[in-house]
From Swiss-Prot:
Keyword Ribonucleoprotein carried by entry: yes
Pfam families noted in UniProt: Ribosomal_L10 (PF00466)
Species whose genome carries this gene: Azorhizobium caulinodans (strain ATCC 43989 / DSM 5975 / JCM 20966 / LMG 6465 / NBRC 14845 / NCIMB 13405 / ORS 571)
Coiled coil feature spans: none
Family of the protein in this entry: Belongs to the universal ribosomal protein uL10 family.
Quaternary organization: Part of the ribosomal stalk of the 50S ribosomal subunit. The N-terminus interacts with L11 and the large rRNA to form the base of the stalk. The C-terminus forms an elongated spine to which L12 dimers bind in a sequential fashion forming a multimeric L10(L12)X complex.
The UniProt record lists the keyword rRNA-binding: yes
UniProt keyword terms in alphabetical order: Ribonucleoprotein, Ribosomal protein, RNA-binding, rRNA-binding
Protein name: Large ribosomal subunit protein uL10
GO biological process: translation
Function field: Forms part of the ribosomal stalk, playing a central role in the interaction of the ribosome with GTP-bound translation factors.
Annotated GO MF terms: large ribosomal subunit rRNA binding; structural constituent of ribosome
Amino acid sequence: MDRAEKQELVTTLSEVFKSTSVVVVAHYSGLTVAQMSKLRRQMKAEGATVKVAKNRLAKIALEGSDVAHVATLLKGPTIIAYSSDPVAAPKVAVEFAKANDKFVILGGAMGKTALNADGVKALATMPSLDELRAKLVGLIQAPATKIAQLSTAPAAKLARVFGAYAKQNEAA
């Protein structure tokens, strides 16, 4: 990697760290190429991204960003996962770590808040933004559904009463 490529990588990572809402750092030594490819596919499916960068270059890119405190975790063979959804990258990383014991979550950051490994795992258990939106829409629609059910209930009861009288008259 020549100097221009390194500067381009630092610039790209710097922009990513300034615009992303969550960063997860993990050790990946011992993972096969197939396992890394699987991790990348899973991250991409959830809207997250995985980068393997030289620690020195990543530390330079972290300077001046909200997640600069993550630089202390960059020791050894580390991988950086990030996403704009605060739950996507941690959720995929935690699920992948459960299946692969060679993938060890070191910690991360959400905004200016530093997270240890347990913090990342706790973040992974939270519902995603889409799930929260779906729950909110369900809560908003629930009263309208109840009103519709209540307004049709008397008519349904009246129809059943007339039906019972009709059966009673036919039997007599």
